[in-house]
């Protein structure tokens, strides 16, 4: 250290006057020439102080070869120098001894006279800071006032940031903010360029500390704390890059000050916020023990002067003594920060960075890190630390402070089993995760919990002594859960309580108002008598009680989820009492009105329906209270009820406010738009819902409430008629309940519908407003493009030498065109037409530039193919570039002043570069095409360009090798010779040719090479811009292009870094390693961060892991690896979560600069987009330095909320690959662009990963760029967005910049992605972030947040719930319609007209309701297309939009939409119930392979196929009982749920493949019973069971044990809800409908004679017994068969197995086959017992199926113990070898017997259902050429360009043909049998078998044992009385038809 021991900084304050450092404080002769100030003594040349032994040339940082001197005094001597010879940090260009840097580096300054003031010059810009502003009141705003230099401002000259760019003019002062280094062109000093690694931080730039001094600080801290050497070097470089980046656009003093403000002391610094939140100001003042933390006020006690003058600081501080308010604390803080020297500021930042750089997982806990830093800082300033002489051992900090915390976090999720870490079977609510640990440090009560091993508290020690005691802390005693992420649906109630309040209450208001017939005493239809007004008001008023109940339940849920012991938990008792009072207020008036009504003792109905004035008044008051309750609870966040975080008075909850509720406020237009959006959404919704849903529901309510059913009931319900008829009499009520529930769901769906529509409208309006739409300035997008390039892409204001704009534009435009040519997007003739050309000018000897006609001619026709192929990638890119420049874009700053940024790409095992084998060989066994063939079909034009290019290259090579020119004759031959080029892209197998083909294919697939090459365009863009904007640089190097290129590279390297985090790099296989090496050679500046592993030092310890960094300049070592530049040891394996976030976290320490762009390994970028980078970074609003010090005490700074994340657009480059790619692309397009546009405006956008830019300091000081708890943070990036939002960061969206992004293209991989998103959303609902946002955001922001994220998934669940509840309702309505006599109903007549025939049931009105429901569901699904069509319209025009829509429809995408909706809904539901959310690696390849039927079936059966099949049977019943044409749409929806996976399977309907696949399916069903088979039905069955049972933990080391990750057993409450209650409700509803169909409604004694059975006795039927027989008999029979098989297996198995290997499978086959046969038999039995009535039989089958499902769910949920991971018990059951299972052979047989009972029935179901699905495809496979049509639909390839069928050998072909014939015969035979079983009984049963069966089963007394097994048939069910008049028949009643009955949509 340079003399700073003991903290004496006088030398520092005197201008760094240490001996040996001759540089004065400021040495910039440009500002201080001889005429000004006393500093002229430094003469024309700045003093070349002698820096110790470090040489006298330059600053002595690097010697001539660019290396740091490794001398004996250097503490790094043993390491071989700062950047030792091998691992040189600067690039190799500095080491090539070509005389580039050999000349003496002389810091000569311009020898000219004084320079004109910058403020007078024309280039005075916002970046120029006026010096008189800087020295207001003789106080330096950038640190302390330097008394010595107070007079330096007289010249009135502003300060321009220095820069790396030298100015090469003599006497000049304008320029791109550059000091003058004064080399005239003729000086011959061109080679003496700055060797500075950090050019803006050099001694010429008035820097407060030189980089050597900063390095000394790092060395000193490292020796005092024991940080790692490599980590220190890494963090030193990190800090210097930050200072260099900031100092390139502001003064170095400002740069350092702003950096310190961002990290430590400013208003937005997380450390400062934490310091006050955790009351550490009090701890520092009086100690926690003496501070009463309970009732601190925020405000100062005495009214303070708002801002003391600087001089009064001491006085003000004295006044504030003893005042512990927040204001006083903040004043003291600012004073302390203001007095701090720049040296101390650097030291604090350095200490923070060193702690952060080694913090590993602790980086996920930002406040824990703040605490560690605070302890370290207190220790650093203590005398004990300053007195240290011996350096502390390396790794001390890591081992003592970080590792114990790391181990605690790891042990929460993992335990050691047999020496290996195994995941614990714990769910989130039992894991103390990163957030729980972090929240310990939010409150003083938490910090007080930190105890040492000796049980003393850490806070009892003085602050300076705490750091050394951290190693003794017993962390296990400190941490506890601060929020329980239990799997429960109540999270939705708590987090989104306002959604439920708004919808349920409004629904109640609407529906209760429209149900007068339910509350009228003795309602009569022909009178239409109304209830008293009091009751009408009061019934509506009960809505307030619903709102209050929701709030009460939400509060109780909060009680459960937020442990009371956490200091941040709100006090809920007061709130609960308040809510109970509100509930009583909302119920009491209604109780009076309904139970103690004034006229309740009236004589007749009319009297009782009259009102008293008091009742009426009470009713109105009740209604008014309800409305106010509703409004209050809708608007008020739950967290804001009665004293909470949201009250600003007390300091009690500052932490929760700071870290969970610091939302950036919306202002101005944004706020207006937010309110406007939600007012229009809910205005439209409430209007439409009232008219369409509720008003039209009025008539069904009326008719169902008066419907009377005469039925005989069921004999099983008792002996009296009343009990027997109990269910069937109430069928109308049951239907009404079901209809109301369905209506309620539609009420929710409506809102989302309007949100989508209006969001789209607002978004489009905004796109017109900013000009990003194709329609806005359409006429001049291209003609103005050159001008826009000049004004928006180039920073020309500061240019030294003024050129004509055309010269500059032409360079940029030509570069873009040539880059497209190089990527083979344009052919050479296109390029010629697009380039600017030099042509001879009219003036003699001069040349001029001719612009391409493209810019003009584009206006005549929208696109001409003469410039580029239509619909090509080139056209898309150029038109987006042109369009984007027509939008408002921030002005770019010169390259020199732009901030440094890093692109970060996490990589796990994604393809780096495709191998030749992958490209030209059919890899998939089921694929029909090579990848190259497929790519050639997709990009024909680009392939042609590539081939031409390759041929030119080959010809050139041939000529160079001296081959003769070709003659005429050869030309014909060469065409044949060229075939290989067109076929595979090369003729010679030399690596340079094959590599070209590999690269071409890789650049069109989803590979890391594509991503890296795309994002390396930033480097090209920076070089291009620097060259174009600084022509003097080009002139200076004259013709030496090599040196010029180096200079440009230096600039690019300084401003941009690309880090790929290759987690597995050190474990790569040979091929992967070669590919990575190829990347490094192609892009030497690419940096790769990876995990390096070393064996443990001692036996039994853990291996040591390191974060290492290499780049293309790193030296290759003997083992083939490269020598890392930095290698930082970690506490252990950093991958504790799902992987991606841990991967990002370990590499984050290697990011450089101010911003990070996070990129996935399947993205792409383009040169023209990279040119806009300066404007994109300007969106962070940090380009212009703030001229006020953040540390002036008493001055309130305007705290502007920092921009944390900037989202960008994505273009999905897989959109032209076929229907699925297009649908996926469309989804992303609308979500990522259309909705992001409005959501960012109204503050509802979060962070979705991909091309988003992050504010580095903001995010890294708040927990990093993603969260990482396993499972919980599955969608890791969105949590970073929520974290940024709740902590006060803004999230913006950038409209004019877009990256490419790949999306998965196969059906399976798209649905994997869907499942991942769905389960991830389930996890988000459990998370604390959702709780904070849901209970604290203001209403408009809350709605934006909800509908943009959770609402989408809730809506999907509601859609599927609505489909299911609608089908159940429809089944009940069908039953009602089937059994009752319809009325002659005319909706146009008055409702008081009598309905005929008398006693009829008006079910026609119900059919109107059914029609409206179908229309609603149609719109709900259709709406998903609207945003995409509108987006296409605005961005690409009418024709393209229409084309895309037609293509999607013809490709049957509506089927796919329905299916995806179900997958979303299912994955969210199953995650909330069972957990198991995990990262699913989604496929990156092309889906051209056919997937076997069995695989598809097993993948989607549980998620969708079973669900669809159940509903389809209900729909079949509805079709046969309540048909109307609109039901056709439902057939489409439900078929979509079943057949989508097969419909989107490539070549599914190819004749041969179909039958080969059928054979596979039969094998899949039967295998796995003799030895374990991963792809078998039994494995699928067991796997679907395990999510309920869980696995046994004991590992038996069997191969079949690896079938799945550990699945924890689901919670009992969740199992009850999803596995027991839901199936029970389903079984009950279907059973009720079945019983009603059999209840003999309207049967009278007159029917005796009409019965087809003589001797028939009228009476209740035995439908329940019939149902029980059909439901339970198959189970009983299966159990019997199994018992017999089990006996045989045990007795004969062990013996027979020796000779008959197939004994087990044969037994299994017999049992399974018998089960399937019995199931079919009992279907027929039901048919017979129902008298061959199809509808009744079907109702019975549906009910029996639901009952069986319920029984099996009960067995699996309650009776089964955990599953073995191996398949042993299943195999043992069939072959009898139980002895191999040890002790388990006692318990397992019984368990396995229960399993087998369920399995047999499930097998039968799968066998029958699988066959029916295959039979559905029969009509399709018979269509000729179906495969071609199907492929056109899937891949959008014309028949001429389609993929050829695979080629088989003769032997294979014969074998396939034989198999096809065999299995085709089997298929069609089974098809005929199945059809016969369904159709025959209905056709011939009644005719031939009727009487025989009747006599056999029913001898006139109800059959055997009087069971009434047979349903009577032939009865006419008609007890109506024609036109007999009934009731009052109020003649001439003037009641008109209600509005509702007139409602028809079409």
From Swiss-Prot:
This is 1,3-beta-glucan synthase component. It comes from Cordyceps militaris (strain CM01) (Caterpillar fungus). GO terms for molecular function: 1,3-beta-D-glucan synthase activity. Belongs to the glycosyltransferase 48 family. Residues 165-180 have a biased composition (Polar residues). Its EC number is 2.4.1.34. GO terms for biological process: (1->3)-beta-D-glucan biosynthetic process; cell wall organization; fungal-type cell wall polysaccharide biosynthetic process. Glycans are attached at residues 171, 290, 1017, 1312, 1649, 1918. It is an enzyme of class 2 (transferase). The chain crosses the membrane at residues 489-509, 537-557, 576-596, 618-638, 675-695, 734-754, 1356-1376, 1413-1433, 1500-1520, 1523-1543, 1615-1635, 1667-1687, 1703-1723, 1738-1758, 1803-1823, 1864-1884. Catalytic subunit of the 1,3-beta-glucan synthase (GS). Synthesizes 1,3-beta-glucan, a major structural component of the fungal cell wall. Involved in cell wall synthesis, maintenance and remodeling. InterPro entries: FKS1-like_dom1, FKS1-like_dom2, Glyco_trans_48_dom.
């Amino acid at each position: 250290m340079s003399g700073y021991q003991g903290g004496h900084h006088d030398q520092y304050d005197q201008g760094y006057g240490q001996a040996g450092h001759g540089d004065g404080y400021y040495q910039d002769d440009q500002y201080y020439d001889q005429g000004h100030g006393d500093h002229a003594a430094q003469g024309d040349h700045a003093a070349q102080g002698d820096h110790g032994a470090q040489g006298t040339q330059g600053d002595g940082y690097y010697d001539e070869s660019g290396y740091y001197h490794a001398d004996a005094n250097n503490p790094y001597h043993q390491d071989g120098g700062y950047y030792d010879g091998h691992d040189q940090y600067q690039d190799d260009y500095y080491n090539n001894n070509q005389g580039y840097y050999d000349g003496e580096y002389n810091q000569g300054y311009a020898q000219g006279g004084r320079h004109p003031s910058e403020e007078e010059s024309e280039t005075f810009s916002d970046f120029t800071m006026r010096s008189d502003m800087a020295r207001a009141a003789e106080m330096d705003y950038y640190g302390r006032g330097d008394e010595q230099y107070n007079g330096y401002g007289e010249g009135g000259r502003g300060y321009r940031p220095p820069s790396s760019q030298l100015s090469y003019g003599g006497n000049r002062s304008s320029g791109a903010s550059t000091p003058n280094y004064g080399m005239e062109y003729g000086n011959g000093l061109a080679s003496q360029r700055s060797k500075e690694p950090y050019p803006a931080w050099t001694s010429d730039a008035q820097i407060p500390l030189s980089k050597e001094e900063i390095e000394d600080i790092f060395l000193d801290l490292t020796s005092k704390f024991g940080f790692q050497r490599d980590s220190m070097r890494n963090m030193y470089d990190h800090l210097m890059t930050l200072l260099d980046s900031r100092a390139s656009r502001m003064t170095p003093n400002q740069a350092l000050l702003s950096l310190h403000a961002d990290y430590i002391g400013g208003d937005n610094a997380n450390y400062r916020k934490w310091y006050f939140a955790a009351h550490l100001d009090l701890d520092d003042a009086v100690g926690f023990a003496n501070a009463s933390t309970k009732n601190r006020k925020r405000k100062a006690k005495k009214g303070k002067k708002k801002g003391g003058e600087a001089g009064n600081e001491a006085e003000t501080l004295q006044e504030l003594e003893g005042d512990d308010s927040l204001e006083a604390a903040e004043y003291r803080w600012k004073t302390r920060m203001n007095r701090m020297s720049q040296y101390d500021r650097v030291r604090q930042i350095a200490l923070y960075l060193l702690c952060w750089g080694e913090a590993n997982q602790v980086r996920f806990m930002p406040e824990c890190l703040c605490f560690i830093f605070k302890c370290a800082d207190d220790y650093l300033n203590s005398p004990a630390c300053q007195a240290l002489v011996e350096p502390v051992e390396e790794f001390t900090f890591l081992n003592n402070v970080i590792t114990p915390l790391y181990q605690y976090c790891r042990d929460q999720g993992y335990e050691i089993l047999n020496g290996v870490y195994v995941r614990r079977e714990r769910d989130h609510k039992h894991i103390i995760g990163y957030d729980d640990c972090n929240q310990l440090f939010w409150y003083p009560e938490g910090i007080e919990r930190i105890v040492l091993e000796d049980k003393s508290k850490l806070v009892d020690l003085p602050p300076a002594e705490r750091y050394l005691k951290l190693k003794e802390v017993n962390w296990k005693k400190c941490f506890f859960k601060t929020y329980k992420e239990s799997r429960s649906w109540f999270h939705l109630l708590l987090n989104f309580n306002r959604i439920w309040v708004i919808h349920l209450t409004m629904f109640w208001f609407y529906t209760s108002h429209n149900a007068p017939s339910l509350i009228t005493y003795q309602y009569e239809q022909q009178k239409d008598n109304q209830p008293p007004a009091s009751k009408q008001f009061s019934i509506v008023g009960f809505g307030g009680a619903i709102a209050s109940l929701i709030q009460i339940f939400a509060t109780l849920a909060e009680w459960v989820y937020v442990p009371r012991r956490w200091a941040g938990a709100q006090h809920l008792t007061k709130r609960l009492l308040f809510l109970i009072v509100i509930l009583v207020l909302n119920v009491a008036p209604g109780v009076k009105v309904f139970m103690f009504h004034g006229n309740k003792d009236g004589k007749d109905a009319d009297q009782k329906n009259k009102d008293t004035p008091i009742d009426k008044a009470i009713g109105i008051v009740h209604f008014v209270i309800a409305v106010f309750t509703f409004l209050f609870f809708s608007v008020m966040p739950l967290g804001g009820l009665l004293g909470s975080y949201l009250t600003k008075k007390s300091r009690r909850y500052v932490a929760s406010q700071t870290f969970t509720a610091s939302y950036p406020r919306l202002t101005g237009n944004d706020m207006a738009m937010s309110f406007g959006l939600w007012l229009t959404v809910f205005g439209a919704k409430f209007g439409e819902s009232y008219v369409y849903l509720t008003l039209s529901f009025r008539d069904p309510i009326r008719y169902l409430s008066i419907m009377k059913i005469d039925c005989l009931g069921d004999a099983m319900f008792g002996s009296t008629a009343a009990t027997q008829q109990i269910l069937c009499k109430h069928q109308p009520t049951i239907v009404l309940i079901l209809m109301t529930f369905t209506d309620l769901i539609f009420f929710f769906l409506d809102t989302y519908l309007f949100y989508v529509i209006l969001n789209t409208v607002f978004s489009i309006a905004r796109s017109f407003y900013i000009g990003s739409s194709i329609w806005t300035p359409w006429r001049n997008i291209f003609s103005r493009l050159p001008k826009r390039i000049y004004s928006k892409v180039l920073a020309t204001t500061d240019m030294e030498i003024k050129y004509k704009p055309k010269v500059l534009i032409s360079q940029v435009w030509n570069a873009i065109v040539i880059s497209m040519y190089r990527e083979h997007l344009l052919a050479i003739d296109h390029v010629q037409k697009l380039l600017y050309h030099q042509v001879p000018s009219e003036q003699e000897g001069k040349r001029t530039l001719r612009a391409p006609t493209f810019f003009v001619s584009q206006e005549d026709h929208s696109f001409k193919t003469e410039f580029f192929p239509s619909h090509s990638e080139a056209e898309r890119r150029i038109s987006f570039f042109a369009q984007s420049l027509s939008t408002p874009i921030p002005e770019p700053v010169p390259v020199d002043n732009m901030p440094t940024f890093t692109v970060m790409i996490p990589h796990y095992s994604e393809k780096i570069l495709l191998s030749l084998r992958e490209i030209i060989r059919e890899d998939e066994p089921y694929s029909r095409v090579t990848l190259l063939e497929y790519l050639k079909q997709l990009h024909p034009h680009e392939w042609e360009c590539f081939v031409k290019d390759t041929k030119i290259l080959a010809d050139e090579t041939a000529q160079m090798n001296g081959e003769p020119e070709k003659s005429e004759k050869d030309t014909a031959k060469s065409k044949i010779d060229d075939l290989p080029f067109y076929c595979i892209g090369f003729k010679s197998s030399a690596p340079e040719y094959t590599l070209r083909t590999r690269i071409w294919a890789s650049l069109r697939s989803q590979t890391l090479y594509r991503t890296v090459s795309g994002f390396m365009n930033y480097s090209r863009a920076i070089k291009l811009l620097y060259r174009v904007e600084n022509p003097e640089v080009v002139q200076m190097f004259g013709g030496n292009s090599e040196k010029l290129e180096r200079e440009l590279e230096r600039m690019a390297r300084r401003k941009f870094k690309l880090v790929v985090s290759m987690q597995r790099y050190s474990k790569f296989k040979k091929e992967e390693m070669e590919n990575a090496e190829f990347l490094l050679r192609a892009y030497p500046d690419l940096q790769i961060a990876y995990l390096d592993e070393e064996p443990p030092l001692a036996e039994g310890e853990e291996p040591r892991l390191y974060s290492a960094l290499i780049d293309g300049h790193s030296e290759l070592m003997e083992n083939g690896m490269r020598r890392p530049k930095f290698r930082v040891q970690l506490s252990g394996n950093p991958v504790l979560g799902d992987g991606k976030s841990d991967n990002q976290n370990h590499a984050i320490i290697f990011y450089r600069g101010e911003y990070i762009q996070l990129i996935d390994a399947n993205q792409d970028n383009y040169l023209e987009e990279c040119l806009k980078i300066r404007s994109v970074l300007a969106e962070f609003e940090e380009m212009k330095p703030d001229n006020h010090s953040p540390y002036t005490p008493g001055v309130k700074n305007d705290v502007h909320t920092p921009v944390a994340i900037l989202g960008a657009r994505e273009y999905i480059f897989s959109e032209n690959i076929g229907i699925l790619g297009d649908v996926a692309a469309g989804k992303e397009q609308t979500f990522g662009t259309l909705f992001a546009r409005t959501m960012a405006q109204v503050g509802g956008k979060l962070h979705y990963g991909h091309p988003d830019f992050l504010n580095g300091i903001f995010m890294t000081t708040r927990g990093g760029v993603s969260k990482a708890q396993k499972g919980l943070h599955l969608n890791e990036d969105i949590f970073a967005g929520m974290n940024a939002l709740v902590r006060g960061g803004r999230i913006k969206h950038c409209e004019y910049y877009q990256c490419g992004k790949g999306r998965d293209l196969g059906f399976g991989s798209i649905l994997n992605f869907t499942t991942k998103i769905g389960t991830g959303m389930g996890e988000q609902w459990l998370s604390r972030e959702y709780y904070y946002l849901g209970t604290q955001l203001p209403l408009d922001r809350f709605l934006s947040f909800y509908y943009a994220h959770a609402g989408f998934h809730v809506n999907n669940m509601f859609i599927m719930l609505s489909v299911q509840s609608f089908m159940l309702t429809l089944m009940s309505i069908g039953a009602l319609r089937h059994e009752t006599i319809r009325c002659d109903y005319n909706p146009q007549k008055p409702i008081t007209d009598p309905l005929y025939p008398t006693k009829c049931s008006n079910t026609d009105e119900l059919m109107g309701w059914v029609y409206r429901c179908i229309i609603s569901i149609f719109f709900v699904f259709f709406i998903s297309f609207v945003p995409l069509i509108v987006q296409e319209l605005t961005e690409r025009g009418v024709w393209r939009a229409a084309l895309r829509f037609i293509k999607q429809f013809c490709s049957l995408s509506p089927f796919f939409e329905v299916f995806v909706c179900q997958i979303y809904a299912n994955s969210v539901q199953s995650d909330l119930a069972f957990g198991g959310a995990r990262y699913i690696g989604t496929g990156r390849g092309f889906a051209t392979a056919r997937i076997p039927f069995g695989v598809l079936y097993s993948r989607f059966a549980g998620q969708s196929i079973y669900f669809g099949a159940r509903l389809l049977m209900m729909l079949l019943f509805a079709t046969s009982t309540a048909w109307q044409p609109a039901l056709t749409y439902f057939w489409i929806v439900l078929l979509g749920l079943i057949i989508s996976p097969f419909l989107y399977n490539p070549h599914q309907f190819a004749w041969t493949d179909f039958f080969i696949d059928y054979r596979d399916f039969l094998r899949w069903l039967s295998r796995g019973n003799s030895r374990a088979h991963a792809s078998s039905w039994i494995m699928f069955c067991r796997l679907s069971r395990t999510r309920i049972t869980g696995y046994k933990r004991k590992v038996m080391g069997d191969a079949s044990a690896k079938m799945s990750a550990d699945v924890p057993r689901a919670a009992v409450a969740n199992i009850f809800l999803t596995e027991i209650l839901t199936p029970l409700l389903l079984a009950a509803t279907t059973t009720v409908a079945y019983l009603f169909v059999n209840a003999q409604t309207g049967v009278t004694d007159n029917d005796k004679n009409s019965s087809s059975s003589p001797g028939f006795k009228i009476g209740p039927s035995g439908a329940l017994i019939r149902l029980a027989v059909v439901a339970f008999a198959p189970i009983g029979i299966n159990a019997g068969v199994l018992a017999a098989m089990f006996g045989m297996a045990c007795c004969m198995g062990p013996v027979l197995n020796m000779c008959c290997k197939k004994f087990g499978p044969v037994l299994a086959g017999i049992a399974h086959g018998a089960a399937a046969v019995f199931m079919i038999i009992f279907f027929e039995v039901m048919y017979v017992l129902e008298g061959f009535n199809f509808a009744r039989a079907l109702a019975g089958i549906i009910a029996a199926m639901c009952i069986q499902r319920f029984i099996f769910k009960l067995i699996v949920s309650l009776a089964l113990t955990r599953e073995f991971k191996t398949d042993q018990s299943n195999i043992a059951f069939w072959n009898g070898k139980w002895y191999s299972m040890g002790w388990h052979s006692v318990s397992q047989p019984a368990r396995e017997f229960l399993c087998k009972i369920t399995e047999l029935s499930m097998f039968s179901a799968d066998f029958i259902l699988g066959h029916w699905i295959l039979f559905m495809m029969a009509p399709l496979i018979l269509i000729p050429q179906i495969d071609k049509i199907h492929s056109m639909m899937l891949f959008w390839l014309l028949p001429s360009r389609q993929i050829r069928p695979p080629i088989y050998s003769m032997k294979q072909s014969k074998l396939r043909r034989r198999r096809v014939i065999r299995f085709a015969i089997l298929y069609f035979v089974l098809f005929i049998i199945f059809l016969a079983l369904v159709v025959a009984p209905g056709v011939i049963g009644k005719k031939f078998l009727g009487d025989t069966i009747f006599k056999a089963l029913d001898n006139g007394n109800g059959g055997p044992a009087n069971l009434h097994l047979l349903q009577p048939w032939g009865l006419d069910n008609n007890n109506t009385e024609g036109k007999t008049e009934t009731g009052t028949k109020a003649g001439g009643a003037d009641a008109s038809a209600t509005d509702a009955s007139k409602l028809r949509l079409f």
